[in-house]
Amino acid sequence: MSRFTDVQFYGSHRVVDFVAWTRAIDGRPVRIFAYAGGGDCVLTNIGEQTPEEAKLRFANLTGLSPLEANDELFRLAEEQRAEQDRLVASGLSRREAIARTRQVGPKSFPGECDVVDLAGMWSINPMDLPEQDHPVSVGWVARLPENLVQ
């Protein structure tokens, strides 16, 4: 990673609710996060929440182990569900209640769109690549060091 000043990795797979992002600056990991849907599935949570994650309203999982981060995401999801139920009981449709709770507070689980939005804030949104003019060039693929696995 020391050959590049800013290295990033992003991943998502909607079928299994998998999302991941990693950023290293000047060869030092700044943020590593990965989640796969269901059960205890925060796979890794290293580093402090970045300003961009906060702007996207991701839950602040700074300092939490994967298990603690997973518990926090599910706690937030339960809070949001309870608020949605309260809004439905007050007369809103379920759809309106979901929309309203998504506008406030942290997101319980980041999704595919969140990953590309974060990519755009850190560097380039991959969804915008077809509209951009980039010269043919060499791409780089690298293996993450084993000591980054939590």
Residue ranges and their predicted role:
Residues 26, 31-150:
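Long, compositionally biased intrinsically disordered terminal regions
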Residues 1-32, 36:
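Single conserved position on a long alpha-helix in the C-terminal lobe of the eukaryotic protein kinase
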